[in-house]
């Protein structure tokens, strides 16, 4: 069984619950939780994945500043940033690398639905998810989002940019995030863990951990969808937009293997990493 290292010396590293009025950074974790191979692991306090920082507490912002955090990388689109602007972390450079995999839930809602439920507010968004679970376009997005993130050339270019920022950073911690810290951020973590030498089991475990964070909401809104007559196809939309669909993610990893031979070849192909790049990342972030 895969072993995991847990560093819980500071509350920020623990999962935050998904609530109507969240306080704190949701779905945040330090990648040092994972053993890579042969007792190697990622340096603690260097690489963080998370949801947006709009609801970060003062203590969390102070913690990130004192690490220190060198870069905050935001994968969100302009409208997402405008609705929930990140709190500022003193001393950190803010870098926007927008990734659009057509997974924006609000894009699947009609103007009438958006108006009825108050625009882009986070809690109201979940009400809209229940409504659009029966929408064929939303079902298509739910099925294809990971494929787009891995195989769309624009997405690949943005993940290549993400790696260039990592490689160019000599000191300090890096935090990267999207809105919920699950799809765009989850794929970024998968690629980063692969570059650092993590095995497939670890990559999948990190991706799937998001479902533990959002489990209560997934169950709640899945029940609502079933109440209105929804079947597995409709429930799959809720799971994909609120949590992650790990089976679909694994399917795309297999597609990478089929098309490129391995995820390492994929990193050296469309993502553009060289052997020197990978060695730089491993020397910087991996320790015994």
Regions found by a protein language model. Name each.
Residues 2-8:
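Sec-dependent signal peptide recognition
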Residues 8, 12-21:
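Bacterial Sec-dependent signal peptides at the C-terminal "C-region" and cleavage site
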Residues 18-175, 187-288:
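Cys-dependent protein tyrosine phosphatase-like superfamily
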Residues 180, 184-185:
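Ser/Thr-glycine-rich phosphate-binding loops at phosphate-binding pockets of nucleotides
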């Amino acid at each position: 069984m895969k072993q995991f290292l847990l560093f819980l010396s500071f509350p920020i590293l623990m999962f935050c619950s998904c609530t109507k009025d969240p306080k704190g950074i949701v779905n945040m974790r330090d990648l040092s939780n994972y053993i890579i191979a042969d007792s190697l692991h990622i340096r603690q306090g260097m690489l963080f994945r998370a949801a947006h920082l709009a609801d970060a507490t003062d203590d969390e912002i102070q913690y990130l500043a004192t690490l220190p955090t060198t870069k905050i990388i935001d994968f969100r689109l302009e409208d997402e940033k405008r609705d929930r602007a990140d709190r500022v972390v003193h001393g950190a450079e803010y870098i926007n690398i927008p990734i659009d995999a057509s997974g924006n839930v609000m894009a699947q809602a009609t103007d009438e639905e958006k108006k009825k439920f108050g625009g882009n507010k986070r809690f109201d968004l979940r009400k809209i998810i229940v409504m659009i679970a029966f929408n064929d376009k939303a079902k298509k997005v739910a099925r294809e989002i990971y494929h787009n993130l891995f195989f769309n050339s624009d997405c690949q270019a943005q993940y290549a940019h993400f790696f260039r920022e990592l490689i160019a950073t000599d000191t300090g911690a890096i935090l990267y995030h999207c809105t919920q810290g699950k799809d765009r951020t989850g794929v970024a973590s998968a690629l980063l863990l692969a570059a650092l030498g993590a095995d497939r089991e670890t990559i999948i475990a990190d991706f799937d951990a998001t479902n533990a964070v959002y489990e209560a909401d997934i169950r709640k809104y899945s029940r609502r969808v079933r109440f209105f007559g929804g079947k597995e196809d409709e429930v799959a939309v809720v799971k994909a937009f609120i949590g992650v669909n790990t089976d679909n993610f694994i399917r795309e990893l297999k597609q990478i293997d089929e098309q490129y031979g391995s995820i390492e070849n994929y990193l050296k192909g469309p993502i553009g990493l060289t052997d020197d790049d990978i060695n730089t990342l491993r020397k910087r972030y991996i320790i015994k």
